C-alpha cells in the first residue's frame, strides 16, 4: 500500500513537473502556428524563458526578422519596378493612339496588329497598377466602418455589363459590418466577383452571402463554373498562377486578382480559401475575426 502511494505521488509530481517544463515548448509551438507573412513582427517568442529554450526563442525571432526584411525588400522592389514601368507604358499607349488617329485607313493585317498591341499594352498597364497596389497595401489605414451589403450592391452595379455578356445572374444575401479599408475591401469583393463572372458558364449564377458565425464575419462567393482541380486550390492565390493559361488570356486576366485578394484579407487579419469546388461550381470563403467585425 505504501509502495503504491509513493508510486502514485511520484506519478503526480512527474506529471506536474513535466507539464511545467513543457509549458515553454507549448508556447513556442502555439506561436509558430500563428505566423503569417503579414504578422512576422507580432509573433516573436518571449526570450525570458527557461535557459534550455532561450536559444530556440532567440533563433526563431532572428529568423522572423530575416523573413520580414526579405518580404520588405520584395515589396520595395515590386513597387520600384511598377513605378518604372508606368511611364514607358503610358508613352506606348499614347503613341498607339496617335498612330491610329493619323492612319485611320490601314490594311486588315495592320489593324489586327494594332489591336493586339493595344490589348497587350493595356494588360501590362493593369498588371503594373496591381503590382503597385500590392506593394503599397501596408500603408493603407484599416480603420473605417464598412457595411458589406451596400458595397456588394455597388459592385454588382459596376460589373453588370460584364455579367450581361454571359447572362450571369448576380445574387446577394445577408449583411454585416466590419472595420477596415473601404477601398481595399471593395477591391477584394470586386476581384472575387469579377473572377466568378469571367470563369462562369453562360446563364450561370454568382451568389455572395454574408453572415456572422462562430465569432467571425463570413463572406462567400459562389459561382456555377467548371470548378478548380484539387491540386490547384491553394496555388490559385499565388501571383501569376493560372489553372488554364489559354482560358485566362481569353478572359483578359493578368494573374494577380486572387493574389491581391489574399493580401487584402491577410492585412485585415482574415483568411481566404477555396471552400468547395466541383464541376458544378466553386465557393471562395473569406472570414474576418471578431476583432475586425461587429454585429
Region spans (language model):
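Short helix-loop "hinge" at the ATP-lid/N-box region of the Bergerat-fold HATPase_c
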Residues: 196-197
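Membrane-proximal HAMP signal-relay module
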Residues: 1-81, 85, 90-111, 115, ...
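Acidic ATP/Mg2+-coordinating residue in the GHKL
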Residues: 223
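Short conserved segments within the C-terminal catalytic ATPase subdomain
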Residues: 40, 162-172
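Conserved micro-motifs of the catalytic ATP-binding
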Residues: 137-144, 177-184
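A conserved beta-strand-to-alpha-helix junction within the catalytic ATP-binding
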Residues: 50, 144-160
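Short beta-strand/loop element within the Bergerat-fold HATPase_c
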Residues: 203-215
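Short conserved segment of the HATPase_c
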Residues: 228-242
Amino acid at each position: 500500500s505504501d509502495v503504491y502511494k509513493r508510486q502514485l505521488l511520484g506519478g503526480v509530481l512527474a506529471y506536474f513537473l513535466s507539464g511545467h517544463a513543457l509549458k515553454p515548448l507549448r508556447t513556442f509551438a502555439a506561436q509558430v502556428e500563428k505566423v503569417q507573412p503579414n504578422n512576422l513582427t507580432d509573433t516573436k517568442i518571449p526570450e525570458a524563458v527557461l535557459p534550455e529554450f532561450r536559444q530556440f526563442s532567440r533563433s526563431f525571432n532572428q529568423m522572423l526578422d530575416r523573413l520580414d526584411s526579405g518580404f520588405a525588400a520584395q515589396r520595395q522592389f515590386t513597387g520600384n519596378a511598377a513605378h518604372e514601368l508606368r511611364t514607358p507604358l503610358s508613352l506606348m499607349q499614347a503613341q498607339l493612339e496617335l498612330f491610329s488617329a493619323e492612319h485611320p485607313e490601314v490594311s486588315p493585317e495592320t489593324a489586327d496588329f494594332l489591336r493586339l498591341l493595344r490589348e497587350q499594352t493595356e494588360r501590362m498597364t493593369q498588371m503594373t497598377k496591381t503590382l503597385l497596389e500590392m506593394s503599397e497595401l501596408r500603408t493603407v489605414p484599416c480603420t473605417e466602418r464598412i457595411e458589406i451589403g451596400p458595397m456588394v450592391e455597388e459592385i454588382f452595379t459596376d460589373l453588370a455589363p460584364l455579367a450581361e455578356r454571359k447572362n450571369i445572374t448576380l445574387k446577394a444575401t445577408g449583411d454585416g459590418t466590419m472595420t477596415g479599408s473601404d477601398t481595399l475591401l471593395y477591391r477584394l469583393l470586386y476581384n472575387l466577383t469579377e473572377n466568378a463572372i469571367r470563369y462562369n458558364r453562360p446563364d450561370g449564377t454568382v451568389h455572395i452571402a454574408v453572415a456572422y458565425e462562430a465569432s467571425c464575419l463570413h463572406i462567400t462567393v459562389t459561382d456555377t463554373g467548371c470548378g478548380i482541380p484539387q491540386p490547384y486550390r491553394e496555388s490559385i492565390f499565388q501571383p501569376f498562377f493560372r489553372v488554364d493559361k489559354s482560358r485566362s488570356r481569353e478572359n483578359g486576366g493578368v494573374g494577380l486578382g486572387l493574389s491581391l485578394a489574399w493580401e487584402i484579407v491577410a492585412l485585415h487579419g482574415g483568411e481566404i480559401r477555396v471552400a468547395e469546388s466541383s464541376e458544378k461550381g466553386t465557393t471562395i470563403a473569406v472570414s474576418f475575426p471578431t476583432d475586425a467585425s461587429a454585429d
